Structures are given as structure tokens and as C-alpha cells.
Amino acid sequence: MIRQRTLKNTIRATGVGLHSGEKVYLTLKPAPVDTGIVFRRADLSPVVEIPARAANVGETTMSTTLVNGDVKVDTVEHLLSAMAGLGIDNAYVELSASEVPIMDGSAGPFVFLIQSAGLEEQDAPKKFIRILREVTVEDGDKRATFLPFDGFKVSFEIDFDHPVLKGQTQSASVDFSSTSFVKEVSRARTFGFMRDIEYLRKHNLALGGSVENAIVVDETGVLNEDGLRSEDEFVKHKILDAIGDLYLLGNSLIGEFKGYKSGHSLNNQLLRKLIAETDAWEVVFFEDASTAPISYMRPVAAV
């Protein structure tokens, strides 16, 4: 049986919020079967919980924000992407502020944290959402689609009218039955343009952004001393973002996601449309792991 999994141990990290610029203490904790991923604002009294579900998304400007009344948690997508990539079903994410720390701008540090905490299988079957037919949302020339696929595959195409990105790979497709999230996607960093920074900061966005936690691009090139981690890092980061956004379904997917110039808003619209169209999906689990179209690395002992 493919089982649900959580963390073996509690683990902590410190960072800054990309948009708020605030110092943030992050604690990842094990959670019982069928809890899902739940964010906790531990700086508030009483503590406020926000489950990582599509219906709780309140803002999608530059990041995905979860809300519960007037309480919010910003920039959840990179951590959720790491949770999805490592198959974590149940965990508590405690924060000392309103934003998940940006770390290095990728999911890599979160993967390291989760692997350091160790993974623990639980005594319940892992639930998957299987896509049964095409579901699409569009906004102008932007598009996001779910398709049936016997596995999990994410295809993405970006089209930035920028001299530097014009020369880079702007499309990618990753079939996770033949390659790993950790290897292919997890280290791709978020990116931003110098031309946008003044506008963003005027609107209290990207206050914590720097070359330490993002790829920064001006009209002539990439400003980061070490350059790109891969030629397709820009589009791979959009895949990373999409995987995090899709995990707001609350379960791992069996199907294909295709995005064309899609972002957090359109990704969330697609999830809401899928959830509403109950004939487009089904919940499945696998008593025999060898029959499943998706496999996960075996849990290893915590380091």
C-alpha cells in the first residue's frame, strides 16, 4: 500500500519574507493522518490555523496567499512545492510572521529541511486525485489546463518580452515518473526584473528581495554573480510554483498540468474549476504500490 506520510521529527529554520522583508521563524512539525498541510500563525494569540486548500487562497499578486478571516500567510508556494515533491501529506507549518521565509528563492532549502527531519509513513492509504477529462481556464492569452495522464507531468511555457529571457529556454516538460522533483525542479529560483523593483517596493512588495534569494535581471543580463543554475531555470521555477499551487488540492495528482503564461491566479482558478466539476476527477488509492503510476522515495532515517 502507498501510505500517507509525515515528518519524523520537528525541525526549525529562520529566514526573511520576500515581500515583507520581516525576519521569520519557521517550524515544521509532524501531523496525524488526514490532517493535510496546515499553516499556523504562532505569533497570534490564540494561534490561527489555515489549511493549505484552494478555497483558502485570498490573494495571488506575485505569490499565493492563504487567508482565514483577516489573518493571512503569504508566499506558501515554494514550501508546498517541496511538500508535494517529497510526498508529505500531513504537517503543521508554524510561523512567527505573516509570510513563509523565502530562503534562497527555490524549494531546495525546504527539501533539505524536510529530508533532515526525516519522513515517516503512516497507517493509512495515501489519497490521489486522478484527472478524468480535460479542464481548462483562460485569461486573455494565458491558459492553464488539466489533462488525464497515467502519472504526474507538468508542462509550462513562458513568453516574457525581455531581451535576456528571449535568449533563454522558455518551455519545459517534466514527467515525474522518469525524473525526480529534487533533481529537476527544486533548485530553480524565483526571478525578478530591475525595471519592476521600484513599482513593487512602492506597493510594499519584494522588500526582502535580493540576489541572495532571487535571480535579478536587468536589460543586459543576469545580475547574480554565479549566473543561472541551469539554462531553463526561469521556466523550471514556474513549474516549481505550479506544483506548489496544485498541492492546494490537498492531495497528490495523477494527471498532467499544462501552463501557458499562467501564474498563481490562473492556477488557483483552475483548481476551483476542477473541484466544482466533480465528474472531471476521482479520489483513488493503491493497496499495491507496484500498480501505482507514481512512486516516492522510501523514507530514510533523519540525519
Curated annotation (Swiss-Prot):
A single GO cellular-component term on record? membrane
In the record, biological process GO terms are: lipid A biosynthetic process
Q: Which top EC class applies here?
A: hydrolase
Catalytic activity, per the record? a UDP-3-O-[(3R)-3-hydroxyacyl]-N-acetyl-alpha-D-glucosamine + H2O = a UDP-3-O-[(3R)-3-hydroxyacyl]-alpha-D-glucosamine + acetate
GO molecular function annotations of the record: metal ion binding; UDP-3-O-acyl-N-acetylglucosamine deacetylase activity
Q: What keywords tag this UniProt record?
A: Hydrolase, Lipid A biosynthesis, Lipid biosynthesis, Lipid metabolism, Metal-binding, Zinc
Record bears the keyword tRNA processing: no
- What residues bind Zn(2+), as annotated? 78, 237, 241
Pathway terms, separated by semicolons: Glycolipid biosynthesis; lipid IV(A) biosynthesis; lipid IV(A) from (3R)-3-hydroxytetradecanoyl-[acyl-carrier-protein] and UDP-N-acetyl-alpha-D-glucosamine: step 2/6
Which top-level group of life is the source organism from? Bacteria
What Enzyme Commission number(s) does the record list for this chain?
3.5.1.108
Active site feature: 264 (proton donor)
Which InterPro entries does the record associate with it?
A: Ribosomal_Su5_D2-typ_SF, UDP-acyl_GlcNac_deAcase, UDP-acyl_GlcNac_deAcase_C, UDP-acyl_N-AcGlcN_deAcase_N
Q: What cofactor requirement does the entry state?
A: Zn(2+)
Q: Which family does it belong to?
A: Belongs to the LpxC family.
Which NCBIfam families does the record associate with it? lpxC
The UniProt function text for this chain reads: Catalyzes the hydrolysis of UDP-3-O-myristoyl-N-acetylglucosamine to form UDP-3-O-myristoylglucosamine and acetate, the committed step in lipid A biosynthesis.
Name of the protein: UDP-3-O-acyl-N-acetylglucosamine deacetylase
